[in-house]
Amino acid sequence: MTATPAPRTSLGSLSVSRLSLGGNVFGWTADEAESFAVLDAYVAGGGNFIDTADVYSAWVPGNKGGESETVIGNWLSSRGNRSDVVIATKVGAHPAYKGLSAATIKAAVDESLTRLRTDYLDLYYTHYDDESVEVSEFLTALDDLVRAGKVREIAASNISAQRLEESLAFSDREGLARYVALQPHYNLVSRDTYEGELADVAARNGVAAVPYYALASGFLTGKYRPGSTVDSARTAKAATYLDTDRGLRVLTALDSVAAAHEAEIATVALAWLAAQPTVVAPIASARTVEQLPALLGVAELTLTDAELKLLDEASA
């Protein structure tokens, strides 16, 4: 795969591709060699926005957390391309660095930088809100990291509309670094996890959405069908959508739109997400190089108003 120019969109001061590559599989279902191949193909296909977290993949027996960052760091070091990619990681869920106290944030960022083999992060998320900590404490700590040059932009994930608004107001009032992005759980079969109050706060405040679970644990690839068996670590979660009328309606609508464009179902699901207000880049992961074209295709696929309406109605 040769390098091709790809559309970029603004995320604060950053310029990112229309698909963010999820790093949760690196060091979990993809070993280092497989991960390197996926990362190489993603960049060759025009991608530049890599998402990970310090906790990936602590849930795997024998892992401690930090495995994904380590794989990505080794790849960055071997390829010498740090300035060509946008690296996003998260703080607050690593077994050794839980929560958002100032001390935790400042210790965790240095561990992430070491594993990623870099001296700065492009985007640093609070992975889960920590309501035991005042927004003033963690935002001041994050601002310190920006001022120190360790972090370029900050963002939030898994936060309520109220706390997001409170955080933005504090940053504005105090002149501190401000969240430029929000990473919500959002896809065609999980709309109420973002739409409504949370999306309204993001839109009012110019905060970009970078949705995770963009393909609903693989359900929106279309490979899970009634009566089918899929060998995947995420099968149980994806299969739950088959038991709902909405899940089946969405698959039918995706089949129709995909056929009209001669596109993969996953590409259509991502294109719907990319067309939603505030969304700049959905996140999707690939365990193999063969899974990437359907994901990268989102940058080239524009759905018609009628197709968007069909998918809206099927997923309502």
Label every model-predicted segment.
Residues 1-83:
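N-terminal binding-site loop/beta-alpha segment at the start of enzyme catalytic domains
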Residues 3, 129, 133-316:
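Beta/alpha (TIM)-barrel catalytic core signal, keyed to glycine-rich beta->alpha loops juxtaposed to Asp/Glu
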Residues 22-33, 91-103, 131-132:
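Active-site mouth loops of central-metabolism enzymes
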Residues 31-42, 100-115, 164-169:
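Short, acidic/polar
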Residues 43-44, 73-84, 113-117, 146, ...:
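Acidic (Asp/Glu)-rich catalytic clusters
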Residues 49-53, 86-89, 120-125, 155-156, ...:
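Short beta-strand segments at enzyme active-site cores
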Residues 56-61, 93-98, 291-294:
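A short acidic, helix-capping loop that chelates divalent metal ions and anchors anionic groups
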Residues 113-132:
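Active-site groove signature of glycoside hydrolases
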